[in-house]
C-alpha cells in the first residue's frame, strides 16, 4: 500500500509550478494514493506470455487517402487578412537578418 503525503503533493505541485490549497493537497494525496495502489496491482500480473504491442486493440490505417482537392479562393481568404502583399499574408518582421 502506498501512502502519498500532503507534503509530497505540495512538493510536486511546487516543482510543476502549480498552486494547490491545503484542502486540494489533502484530497489529491488520497486520490494519488489510490491510483498508485491500482498501478501496484497491475505490477503483480504475470505478463510473460503476453505478446508486446503498442496498441491494446488491433489498429489498421484509418486515415483517408491523400487526395488533392480544390482549396479556398485566395481573394476570399485574403479579404480577412489585416495586411497582404503580392497575394500572400503579410506579417510583422520578428527577426532581422
From Swiss-Prot:
GO terms, biological process: glutaminyl-tRNAGln biosynthesis via transamidation; regulation of translational fidelity; translation
Enzyme Commission number: 6.3.5.-
SS bonds (residue pairs): none
Catalytic reaction equation(s): L-glutamyl-tRNA(Gln) + L-glutamine + ATP + H2O = L-glutaminyl-tRNA(Gln) + L-glutamate + ADP + phosphate + H(+); L-aspartyl-tRNA(Asn) + L-glutamine + ATP + H2O = L-asparaginyl-tRNA(Asn) + L-glutamate + ADP + phosphate + 2 H(+)
One example GO MF annotation: asparaginyl-tRNA synthase (glutamine-hydrolyzing) activity
Principal EC category: ligase
SUPFAM superfamilies named in the record: Glu-tRNAGln amidotransferase C subunit
UniProt keyword list: ATP-binding, Ligase, Nucleotide-binding, Protein biosynthesis
Purpose of the protein: Allows the formation of correctly charged Asn-tRNA(Asn) or Gln-tRNA(Gln) through the transamidation of misacylated Asp-tRNA(Asn) or Glu-tRNA(Gln) in organisms which lack either or both of asparaginyl-tRNA or glutaminyl-tRNA synthetases. The reaction takes place in the presence of glutamine and ATP through an activated phospho-Asp-tRNA(Asn) or phospho-Glu-tRNA(Gln).
Similarity comment: family membership: Belongs to the GatC family.
Assembly mode: Heterotrimer of A, B and C subunits.
HAMAP family: GatC (MF_00122)
Protein name: Aspartyl/glutamyl-tRNA(Asn/Gln) amidotransferase subunit C
Species for this entry: Listeria welshimeri serovar 6b (strain ATCC 35897 / DSM 20650 / CCUG 15529 / CIP 8149 / NCTC 11857 / SLCC 5334 / V8)
Highest classification ranks of the organism: Bacteria, Bacillati, Bacillota, Bacilli, Bacillales
Amino acid at each position: 500500500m502506498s501512502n502519498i503525503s500532503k507534503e509530497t503533493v505540495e512538493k510536486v505541485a511546487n516543482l510543476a509550478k502549480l498552486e494547490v490549497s491545503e484542502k486540494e493537497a489533502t484530497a489529491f494525496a488520497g486520490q494519488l494514493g489510490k491510483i498508485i495502489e491500482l498501478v501496484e496491482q497491475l505490477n503483480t500480473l504475470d505478463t510473460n506470455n503476453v505478446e508486446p504491442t503498442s496498441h491494446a486493440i488491433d489498429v489498421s490505417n484509418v486515415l483517408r487517402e491523400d487526395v488533392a482537392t480544390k482549396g479556398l479562393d485566395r481573394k476570399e481568404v485574403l479579404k480577412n487578412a489585416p495586411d497582404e502583399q503580392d497575394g500572400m499574408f503579410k506579417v510583422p518582421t520578428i527577426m532581422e537578418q
